[in-house]
């Protein structure tokens, strides 16, 4: 009798085991990544939790995860995703019915070892008139591309705050963006979240409905691009903090396992990691990324650049020889009420030129040539420093030089100081123009000063960027 019971038990156990294995196999997601009808090997496929490679025939199998909304690919160098106007179609929604998800790639007709990308942030459309401002910006982008960028591989990175708490404008933003026919890779911003939902996990679902996963990656040449969500909704009115959750950090670690150490890495996220070289642990939680140190640790060993927005002003921080942050000023300027930001930076966008694993960059002001890299103020323009000439050099970093000449005589380097941009101060004090009472000028550290020996002399300011490009501007006296 005992033997019979034992055999029955073992038989049942085998049946259960087979059923579990069958369910596991059935729950796997599989598919094919192909180009021109042929499978593409070694393409990274992810469900947001796991990362796998396609085999020699372009096939993949990845575990089903109950919290995964998408299966998506990291577009490999030399290829492009299928595109619906400006929207790259590198992902598919897991619908719960199908287990097979195939992807089609397009062979890039251009050599993407050399490529260019533009960085925009804080478009922040909240009403119809804002769309008109965004269209004007896109016209500037289109003109710049036609004149300066001809046959290079090109795309745009949007660092978030596409709308201003108005998800209903996502479709209008997309429609406007489609005019320039360039792929745009979007990053979620705090004003792109859904507020009033019960938890962080629900705050980004509307964004995903329009633009796909909130974290993902793609390649061009010897550069790896990563988009992250660091807006952590804490469900108290409109409260959020700058924070990258553990799920995203774990995915990032897995994603980077497939990236050679000699490749450039760019990370796009909305909220800055830090506005200072040394992390300030008393910084306001919505203004910086509270666990930025964890991100830095994961990026060690790579030459990495962080691309952020959120602040509505422009600055660069060099953390060390292999890590730098570029915080890009707002496309919307002073919330579409003026074409400069509250630090005096003109509305604009970043232009990054990648060659192999090297990169150069510049800031492009809307309505100006790319040589417009600073603004000068004569004696008397600043009520803070009425005796000084002042230069606002918005894309400055520690490797730039700002020098001045008086009547052709070299006078030396100008002194950097923290203060208010005179024009921004005037604009922000005009409450009828800016409408919002809370708009104020902010102090910036990319201002430079000098006191002329003769205030009526011909003054010229010469700025040299970190790449050796020289920009000159004469100071016009106030009459």
Name these PLM-found stretches.
Residues 323-396, 400-407, 445-474:
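Binuclear metal-dependent phosphoesterase catalytic core
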Residues 77-82, 88-93, 167-261, 282-307, ...:
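Extended active-site neighborhood of metal-dependent phosphoesterases/phosphodiesterases
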Residues 43-47, 70-71, 402-404:
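Hydrophobic beta-strand segments
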Residues 25-26, 32, 36-37, 43-53:
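Short amphipathic beta-strand segments in non-cytosolic proteins
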Residues 421-449:
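Aromatic sugar-binding surface patches on proteins
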Residues 49-63:
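Short, acidic Ser/Thr/Gly-rich low-complexity loop/linker segments typical of extracellular
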Residues 24-29, 35-36, 75-170, 455-460:
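N-terminal active-site segment of His-dependent metallophosphoesterases
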Residues 256-281:
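Short acidic, glycine-rich surface-loop motifs adjacent to enzyme active sites
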